[in-house]
Amino acid sequence: MSRIGKKPVVIPSGVTINVAAGNKVEVKGAKATLSKTFSTDVTFSVADNVATITPNNNSKNAVAQSGTARAILSNMVEGVSKGFERKLKIIGVGYRAKAQGNELNLTLGFSHPVVYKLPQGITAETPAPTEIILKGADKELLGKVASEVREYRKPEPYKGKGVRYEDEYVAKKEAKKK
């Protein structure tokens, strides 16, 4: 059986979990409200500030789904209580970013500025023109947004120019010699 799925999710104070019909789970907290529909192979039970996920049968798929559901529920609880953030760095001459409301204006060496509309629930800050901080309660959506912003200009392997995650290491290639 999955060891992750066996672990209960501790619910901090100020966070409530409601399980509706069809395995639709809603997590409410100080920062946001998140809801997700999970597989019918698992059953949720909430008691005494602890949520447990149990597989409906011992099939390989049900056990795998219990571990996945537990990890997602844990991320939802952490997201509505503390929130998540992802930092991006921009490296390159003239490469800049500026957050304006729910838009992110990127100057990445194209003939035109790139305007990225942030989805609801995600906020962006630019403490420096070469630094982007994305914040949100939904870890999955935050990762998707960070990936889409990075996709506009991935770090190239010769000089390392482009948009990268703060903790990302870019392996550099040696230039061709005559």
Curated annotation (Swiss-Prot):
For whether the record's keyword set contains RNA-binding, the answer is: yes
Q: Which SUPFAM superfamilies match?
A: Ribosomal protein L6
Give GO terms for biological process.
cytoplasmic translation
The cross-references to InterPro entries, in alphabetical order and at most eight, read: Ribosomal_uL6-like, Ribosomal_uL6-like_a/b-dom_sf, Ribosomal_uL6_a/b-dom, Ribosomal_uL6_bac-type, Ribosomal_uL6_CS
Which terms in the Gene Ontology molecular function aspect does this entry carry? rRNA binding; structural constituent of ribosome
Which UniProt keywords are present, listed alphabetically?
A: Ribonucleoprotein, Ribosomal protein, RNA-binding, rRNA-binding
Per the record, its GO cellular-component terms are:
cytosolic large ribosomal subunit
Write down the Pfam families for this protein, in alphabetical order.
Answer: Ribosomal_L6 (PF00347)
The similarity annotation says: Belongs to the universal ribosomal protein uL6 family.
Q: What does this protein do?
A: This protein binds to the 23S rRNA, and is important in its secondary structure. It is located near the subunit interface in the base of the L7/L12 stalk, and near the tRNA binding site of the peptidyltransferase center.
Instruction: Indicate the quaternary assembly.
Output: Part of the 50S ribosomal subunit.
Q: Which NCBIfam families match?
A: L6_bact
Q: What is this protein called?
A: Large ribosomal subunit protein uL6
The species this protein was found in: Francisella tularensis subsp. holarctica (strain LVS)
Q: Gene symbol?
A: rplF
